[in-house]
Amino acid sequence: MKSVLILALVFLLMLFSGCGARQTDESKVIDMTHSFDEQTIYWPTAQPFHWEKEAWGQSAGGYWYSAGRYSASEHGGTHLDSPIHFGEGKSTIDQIPLSRLMGPAVVIDITAACASAPDYQLTAADITAWEQAHGEIPAGAIVLVKTGWSKFWPDRKRYLGSDVPGDTANLHFPGLSREAAEFLAKKREIDGLGIDTASMDPGSSMDFIAHQILNGANIYGLENVANLEQLPAKGATLLALPMKIKGGTGGPVRIIAFLP
């Protein structure tokens, strides 16, 4: 199944690169990535994103030249959590096979529950309800949890629950429950888990149990995912390509969805 999907994705990319494709097919490609700038949300204890110009203008030789430098923690903005982030001995970001960075997108919508409960946790019942409507989650899928939280981006106070640097005691946003993480890790064969909040775990978590379970099963995470409201519950194909940092525990990722 996964090999067929990869071939289909290659075919799609060939179509999109063809003559005239931009006029007819670009509406079927969704960018699931928040831009990186000084407002990009990072974990309260992490070094935020910083970019500055090194050169910008006409060179001594009379031609235009521009260059910049950036710095940041691995974990912030739209990024990928490598399994080694919370899974000892598991894959670093450069060790994740390319075949696992693409797959069918499964979008589980819990926006209604999260609207009235900021600390809501995805349950196993939410997952099985999705399956009753759409069929069992296929092997190699990338499960995306839609909480509706991206509407608060980049307002740190509303998105995280606190805009105080270093404050991890007063965070409030949705995430996964232990039972949901265990269900996906043990009863399904997913490659990745994405969410439109700052963490796979809810903001109130102190032990990051969803990270422990999923990363421990060599499942990577995608956090601060954008534009989930533009994807159907099933049928889209996701491509998530992170910066290839040797030995990295995570890094910025460009996520693209191809609509059916």
State the predicted function of each range.
Residues G20-P260:
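Active-/binding-site microenvironments in catalytic and ligand-binding cores
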Residues L7-L15:
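Bacterial N-terminal signal peptides
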Residues M1-V4:
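Positively charged n-region of N-terminal signal peptides that target proteins for export
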